[in-house]
């Protein structure tokens, strides 16, 4: 299912304003030229009007940010997000599958949904990263990624108020790395394969 030249799949999960700030910080430190598909989940109410794509595009000018379309094959060097009522998950051909999140049926479980999908469908060429938040969403998904042979990372809260999200991770499976955004980006730069000169469109 996964050839050695297939891109890795990296998924970030966070919640709240601190989580958004951490996403922006990590995306601005994102290593250039890595052969990896990048997906981001931030907790949002399903009935919200969301400007997340515009915010990320403005604050992270070095990355192209897209709202994934159902069935779209995701490619490296693009940051993909879902919609508030259609959270992003991934199929085994690296195409987006936007699941039904209307009426908040997946409220505070959208990170786990994405993490579980990459663990099940991609396997060992995956990285799950949990950033700031006050909930445990992502902990079960990280455990699934670990069982599939992927890498699991957690943001070190440093001097920030410690959220339950990071605390819960320790109870659900080993973590590959804990660090700040810059350190996580440096580890990814060393671990992920480099992209060939072929341009993806």
Specify the residue positions occupied by each region the protein language model found:
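Conserved acid/base catalytic micro-environments in cytosolic active-site loops
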Residues: 1-201
């Amino acid at each position: 299912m996964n050839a050695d030249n297939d891109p890795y799949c990296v998924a970030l999960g966070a919640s709240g304003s601190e989580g958004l700030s951490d996403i922006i910080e990590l995306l601005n430190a994102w290593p250039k030229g890595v052969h990896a598909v990048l997906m981001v989940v931030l907790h949002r109410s399903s009935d919200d009007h969301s400007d997340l794509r515009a915010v990320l595009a403005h604050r992270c000018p070095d990355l192209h940010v897209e709202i994934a379309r159902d069935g779209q094959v995701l490619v490296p060097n693009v940051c993909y997000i879902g919609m508030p009522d259609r959270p992003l998950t991934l199929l085994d051909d690296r195409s987006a599958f936007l699941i039904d999140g209307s009426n908040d049926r997946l409220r505070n479980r959208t990170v786990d949904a994405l993490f579980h999908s990459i663990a099940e469908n991609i396997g060992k060429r995956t990285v799950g990263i949990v950033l700031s938040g006050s909930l445990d969403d992502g902990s079960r998904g990280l455990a699934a990624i670990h069982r599939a042979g992927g890498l699991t990372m957690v943001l070190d809260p440093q001097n920030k108020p410690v959220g339950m999200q990071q605390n819960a991770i320790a109870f659900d499976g080993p973590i590959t790395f804990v660090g700040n955004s810059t350190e996580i980006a440096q580890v990814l730069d060393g671990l992920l394969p480099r992209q060939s000169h072929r341009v993806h469109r």
